[in-house]
Amino acid sequence: TIESNDKIVAFIDSLELPKILKNDSNINHTSSDGQKFNIKSSIDSTNAGFSFKYFGTAKGVSVYTFIDESHKLFYSTVINVSERESGYVIDGLMHNEVVKSDIHSTDTHGFSEVIFGLTHLLGFSFAPRIKNFKDQQLYGINSPKDYQNKGYILLPKRKINFEIIEENWDDILRFILTIKSRRTTASQLLKRLTSYSKHHKLYTAIKEFGKIIKTNFLLVYIDKVELRQRIEKQLNKSEASNRFAKAIFFGNNAEFIFASQEEQNIANNCKRLIQNAVILWNYLYID
């Protein structure tokens, strides 16, 4: 089903009409978002979790799906509802064969300082939608007092710890090369780093580097209304795609009936295949 999806996505990409939907013909803006689905009550799945907000007393999973400006669904995976979506952002950007992203957006659940650092080093511009901007922390090259003395209105919380970044720089580059090799996923590597009782020094160093990238993005984000509008527009496509997925995934009371993550991913990619086929049909019909 993954190969079939890739072929449809590649064919859509070869059409002229989808190119009209892009803001910039030289830049591909993508986004990702999670959608919750119930697991059938009689199914015992280790990949399912509880969330009263979404499932009440039942269990369910989260389907994390990637979409580009032309509405092509180029990657999707089923994850445990208790996991943070941000850990899977890089998986979709690196482990698909047909869509090259230049700018990637998520909602608040999809970003972290570590993801800011990793996406920058991998060559992607990470541009999430920021909720409660006033609660976000800025970081500076110098101490906060230096910026205060210069009369800056926006002040950093503290100075970046360049020492820990420099000490672990070689390991950071090795980590990036491992992700680029695609022998394993970034989500698996990050799980390993965060499994230690204390923060691993490599994880801490990547996070510290990410604070630099995040701070720069926040300053641009608050200054440029066009950027905020572009991010909102792209994330609206993710949310519209989720509603479309609900309409497609109507069998079995819109519940997953498989226990293993592998089977759940097969079912999910079949749903994605139908969605991509409908999108392709619409392009051909309009054209």
Predicted regions and their residues:
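Short, conserved catalytic/metal-binding motifs centered on acidic residues
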Residues: T1, T30-K36, H104-H109
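Short, basic alpha-helical nucleic acid-contact segments in DNA-binding proteins
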Residues: I2-K19
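Acidic, metal-coordinating catalytic cores used for nucleic-acid/nucleotide bond scission
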Residues: H104-F116, N132-Q137
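Long, compositionally biased intrinsically disordered regions
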Residues: K150, K157-D287
